[in-house]
A protein has these predicted regions:
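Short, N-terminal intrinsically disordered low-complexity segments that are rich in Pro/Gly
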Residues: 13-17, 73, 115, 157
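Short, well-ordered alpha-helices that flank and scaffold nucleotide-derived cofactor binding pockets
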Residues: 29, 60, 64, 158-162
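Conserved catalytic/switch belt of AAA+ P-loop NTPases
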Residues: 130, 157-167
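P-loop NTPase nucleotide-binding core
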Residues: 36-151, 168-169
């Protein structure tokens, strides 16, 4: 009996991978363009069709580039809080935030900074973080797998729309 060329581990690339090269390249080209035509893609399909694998491959490709920051969020948790925590934990950005005397201690991120007013709204905190990502000429890819219609997703989508309107490099 021969081994099954497919995998039941969601998101893990199977031995027999059905490449979505055209679609993957279209998304990568769009995201990497000087002026992106799209900053959001929703990958849909039937169960087992390779949505998570495709998303993982796109994230992997962008992670290899120095001008990209890639974070993965869990849709069952507070996405804005998780995003702030993940951005804050990136050593290069963490140092930028401390040097800029940004106090995110109200969210359990880092330490209180003397003579700095604490940021008390998570959306404002993320906007400050995104400004520093923009100043450092980087782009931020956020991937969320298995999205459902939940309050966390609706809040995140509303904030994401605001970030897009403010021209932050968020994808």
């Amino acid at each position: 009996m021969s081994a099954n060329p497919f995998t039941l581990s969601f998101g893990k690339k199977p031995l027999q991978y059905i490449s979505r090269l055209t679609e993957t390249n279209q998304i990568l080209e769009s995201f990497c363009a000087e002026i992106p035509s799209n900053q959001i893609y929703m990958i849909t399909g039937v169960r087992g069709s390779g949505k998570t694998v495709m998303m993982t491959n796109i994230a992997s490709e962008l992670r290899k580039r120095e001008d990209w920051i890639v974070v993965e969020l869990n849709p069952t948790r507070d996405l804005l809080q998780s995003l702030a925590a993940k951005i804050y934990s990136i050593p290069e950005l963490h140092t930028l935030f401390i040097n800029a005397k940004l106090d995110f201690s109200a969210f359990g991120l880092g330490v209180s900074i003397e003579n700095a007013a604490p940021v008390t709204d998570i959306e404002n905190a993320l906007e400050l973080m995104l400004k520093y990502i923009q100043k450092s000429e980087k782009r931020l890819l956020i991937s969320v797998d298995e999205v459902t219609n939940s309050e966390y997703i609706r809040i995140f989508a509303s904030s994401f729309q605001i970030f897009l309107r403010n021209d932050y490099p968020i994808f």
